[in-house]
């Protein structure tokens, strides 16, 4: 039997760390198809912290792609599970036959599904990528992303699967300990990545609430982002008084970030695609409602779980936010499909499907 190989094809340390730790701690002990990884980027201590996994690291996305293609050609029974945002060479290999459809299973993280960049090289590449995506053996994704993908590629198998957000189920009831009143605190974006469209989001928050709320913008990730942070700070201070604007430029440990989220009353996410599911889960767990772009299909997942959804086009005020908080507080968090531990069984199913052991 040929063991499934997992591919992290882009050097995205935060996401790669989450996936590797999840597989090491949760899946590797029960499935031989959860142990082999090819990773773009440096080791960064992963080998030591994930002893249950067999990890191979590659210095560039191109080097990783060449290694994957070589393995695919050498053994056509070899199957690969591609996680999230990977690279151009892998899509082109699928398009050219270097990797066959039956070898290619893809967990959609969002960015590789949507065509949001206006750069010329991206606009030229998107049609090729779209054709290639129609040739994958199967996809795994959120409900909203499955719906989006199926409209373009109705013949490709799709299965529900959620990114393994680090969550402590014992915290599901913790939010009820806090009494929410007074000035609203609004979280804008889930990281310092430009895809959060921070400046547009700050303007939207100001248009809805004016300079009457506390605004928190976490921008400690990714690194080497100071010029953009300064740009966002300048734009924010043109709208909000200094005491109402908090731009966080330092990377935070998980527990610190969790404590920050739990001080918020509302999350505001203007991006028009599915991303930041980890932050959304942690906010929902704390009874903090989220404002989404109507073009972000994750609202379908939230609605399916009977969670209140606010949109950027809604008329928002404190009363609307407090009512959404009340509705969230009445939801039994233990039944939410994309919460831990409920997302575990779909992962076991996904491994069997990608490995060819399940119909």
UniProtKB/Swiss-Prot annotation:
Its main location: membrane. It catalyses: beta-D-ManNAcA-(1->4)-alpha-D-GlcNAc-di-trans,octa-cis-undecaprenyl diphosphate + dTDP-4-acetamido-4,6-dideoxy-alpha-D-galactose = alpha-D-FucNAc4-(1->4)-beta-D-ManNAcA-(1->4)-D-GlcNAc-undecaprenyl diphosphate + dTDP + H(+). GO terms for cellular component: plasma membrane. GO terms for molecular function: 4-acetamido-4,6-dideoxy-D-galactose transferase activity; fucosyltransferase activity. Transmembrane segments: none annotated. One of its GO terms (biological process) is fucosylation. It is a peripheral membrane protein. Its EC number is 2.4.1.325. It is an enzyme of class 2 (transferase). Pathway: Bacterial outer membrane biogenesis; enterobacterial common antigen biosynthesis. Keywords: Cell inner membrane, Cell membrane, Glycosyltransferase, Membrane, Transferase. This is TDP-N-acetylfucosamine:lipid II N-acetylfucosaminyltransferase. It comes from Salmonella paratyphi B (strain ATCC BAA-1250 / SPB7).
């Amino acid at each position: 039997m040929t063991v499934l190989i997992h591919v992290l094809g882009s050097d995205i340390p935060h996401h790669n760390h989450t996936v590797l730790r999840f597989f090491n701690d949760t899946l590797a002990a029960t499935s031989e198809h959860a142990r082999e990884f090819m990773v773009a980027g440096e080791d960064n201590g992963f080998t030591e912290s994930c002893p249950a996994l067999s990890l191979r690291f590659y210095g560039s996305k191109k080097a990783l792609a060449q290694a994957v293609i070589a393995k695919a050609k050498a053994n056509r029974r070899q199957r690969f599970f591609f996680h999230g945002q990977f690279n151009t060479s892998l899509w082109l290999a699928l398009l050219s036959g270097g990797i066959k459809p039956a070898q290619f299973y893809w967990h959609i993280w969002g960015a590789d599904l949507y065509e949001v960049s206006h750069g010329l090289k991206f606009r030229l590449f998107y049609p090729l990528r779209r054709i290639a995506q129609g040739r994958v053996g199967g996809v795994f994704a959120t409900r909203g992303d499955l719906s989006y993908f199926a409209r373009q590629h109705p013949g490709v198998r799709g299965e529900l699967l959620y990114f393994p957000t680090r969550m402590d189920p014992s915290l599901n009831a913790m939010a009820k300990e806090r009494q929410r009143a007074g000035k609203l605190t609004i979280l804008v974006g889930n990281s310092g990545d430009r895809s959060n469209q921070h400046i547009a989001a700050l303007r939207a928050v100001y248009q809805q609430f004016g300079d009457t709320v506390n605004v928190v913008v976490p921008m400690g990730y990714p690194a080497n982002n100071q010029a953009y942070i300064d740009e966002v700070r300048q734009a924010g201070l043109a709208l909000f008084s200094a005491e109402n604007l908090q731009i966080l430029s330092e990377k935070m440990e998980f527990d610190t970030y969790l404590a920050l989220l739990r001080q918020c009353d509302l999350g505001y996410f203007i991006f028009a695609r599915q991303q930041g599911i980890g932050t959304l889960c942690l906010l929902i767990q704390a009874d903090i409602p989220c404002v989404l772009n109507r073009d972000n299909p994750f609202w379908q997942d939230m609605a399916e779980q009977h969670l209140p959804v606010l949109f950027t086009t809604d008329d928002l005020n404190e009363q609307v936010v407090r009512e959404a908080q009340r509705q969230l507080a009445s939801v039994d968090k233990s039944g939410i499909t994309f919460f831990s531990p409920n997302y575990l069984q779909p992962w076991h199913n996904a491994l069997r499907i990608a490995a060819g052991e399940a119909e």
